[in-house]
Amino acid sequence: TLIGEGAFMNCYSLKSLIIPDSVTSIGDRAFWGCRSLKSLIIPASVVNIKADLFYEWYGELECLSPYFICDNKVLFDKDKSTIIAFKDKDTTSYVIPDYVTSIGDRAFHECSSLKSLVIPDSVISIGNGAFSVCRSLKSLVLSNRVTSIGDSAFEGCSSLKSFVIPDSVTSIGDDAFWSCRSLN
């Protein structure tokens, strides 16, 4: 069973939701804008979670699925190699742990308080829209092992002033730095 794309999108008054054990997949933007939802438990049956699930949802997340790990407001895949969603919208700086190899699609989308970010050498790919609309992001240190930067990866990072693309990068997606107005 699937919770479809945008299934509960902008259900501003939704206060509680129990995901049944029959659900195996949760679609893109399923809980966008569910501002009143206090907590959410991902059941053990869930094996697939799409990108950008939690935009404008700041409740408590508990993950019972063996396929995912929730640690300090960060949702990882089961081996913590991919960041699926970063839910700490109030943090101003973040150092991605050195066991992460991939930043998922829209994982940090609109983390508007994030000002500085360190991406360690373990990271080799940055997903589509991974840091899109992180308007306060000014400082970015990128891994020397990154090979791909996805479409719209840094789109709308309007405070980003400088950025060094390492020689290891072989692919930069469409609109990767679109609307980065402060970029020199």
Q: What is the predicted function of each stretch?
A:
Residues 1-2, 11-25, 35-48, 57-74, ...:
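Structural signature of tandem-repeat unit edges
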